[in-house]
Swiss-Prot record:
GO terms for molecular function: spermidine synthase activity. Homodimer or homotetramer. GO terms for biological process: spermidine biosynthetic process. It comes from the Bacteria. This is Polyamine aminopropyltransferase. Pfam families: Spermine_synt_N (PF17284), Spermine_synth (PF01564). Its main location: cytoplasm. Residues 5-238 form the PABS domain. It is found in: Cytoplasm. S-methyl-5'-thioadenosine binds at residues 33, 108, 140-141, 165. Keywords: Cytoplasm, Polyamine biosynthesis, Spermidine biosynthesis, Transferase. Catalyzes the irreversible transfer of a propylamine group from the amino donor S-adenosylmethioninamine (decarboxy-AdoMet) to putrescine (1,4-diaminobutane) to yield spermidine. InterPro entries: PABS, PABS_CS, SAM-dependent_MTases_sf, Spermi_synthase, Spermidine_synt_N, Spermidine_synt_N_sf.
Length: 287
């Protein structure tokens, strides 16, 4: 029996995780980053950019459901949604399940990611790239929100970690542009890393977002691939009530949507805003 190739993630210098590689489906350096898609017995197809795992078939639903349904159901009447990043198509798939949404714009810096993922991760997008409400823009996210004249009800930043091309999506320029592009009553959410290991990222985002939004917080979910504990998602709006929607209202909205989820429930939604004390203390000490 031949020994399987081992792929090591390089996100952290002193510790990490590895994956056995059953088969490499694609590996190439695009114009912006090094992209690999391979098969793993336990997690299915795995995509990594610049040595960091972005998504796996086995657990992607947790990430995509939480980053989509929490803001959309909190808003309650989102018509226009902007996705920054999200080239694997999972976020688009979940947003497109909301039939009340009339227009979905996705801004992806790397056209290669979209092409490769449509071919090698078809279950992520599940045909949503063909949704007539969808518009794909190949551009840098910061540049787009700086120049865009359109307004959106929900903005989802499905960004990579703040290294390489994803670094700009954690800057004040980006957050300011997103605030400018939101309609009144709009909500901004973003991937913000595993807070036990990447606490500085959460503190930095909280500080920067606070300059442009009246209500800034985080919510969380545990996603096995993103090891180290709970992953945090940044939340920003100018209406604190949107973060405190009652369970009855959420249940009604969720039932009316007709959406069936594998992770998200209205109760999970409410509980996700309960944060561990170590993060609350770090945010408080940074003020």
């Amino acid at each position: 029996m031949s020994q399987k190739e081992i792929w090591y993630e390089t996100l952290h210098a002193n510790f990490g995780q590895y994956f056995s590689v059953d088969r490499v489906l694609y590996h190439e350096k695009t114009d912006h980053q090094d992209l690999i898609i391979f098969e793993n017995d336990a997690l299915g197809r795995v995509m990594a950019l610049d040595g960091v795992v972005q998504t796996t078939e086995r657990d992607e639903f947790i990430y995509h459901e939480m980053l989509t349904h929490v803001p959309l159901l909190s808003h309650g009447n989102a018509k226009r949604v902007l996705i920054i990043g999200g080239g694997d198509g999972g976020m688009l798939r979940e947003v497109s399940r909301h039939h009340g949404v009339e227009h979905i714009t996705m801004v992806e810096i790397d056209a290669g990611v979209v092409e490769f993922c449509r071919q090698y991760l078809p279950n992520h997008s599940a045909g949503s790239y063909d949704d007539p409400r969808f518009n794909l823009v190949i551009d840098d996210g910061v540049n787009f929100v700086r120049q865009c004249s359109d307004k959106f009800d929900v903005i989802i930043s499905d960004c990579t970690d703040p290294i390489g091309p994803g670094e700009s999506l954690f800057t004040s320029d980006f957050y300011q542009g997103c605030a400018r592009c939101l309609n009144e009553g709009g909500i901004f959410v973003a991937q913000n890393g595993v807070c036990f290991l990447q606490q500085d990222e959460a503190v930095g985002s909280h500080k920067k977002l606070g300059h442009y939004f009246k209500d800034v917080s985080f919510y969380q979910a545990a996603i096995p691939t993103y090891y180290g504990g709970i992953m945090t998602f940044a939340w920003a709006s100018n209406n604190p009530a949107l973060r405190q929607i009652d369970a009855t209202t959420l249940r009604q909205r969720f039932a009316q949507s007709g959406i069936t989820c594998r992770y998200y429930t209205p109760d999970v939604h409410i509980g996700s805003f309960a944060l561990p004390q170590y993060l609350l203390s770090a945010l408080q000490n940074a003020q």
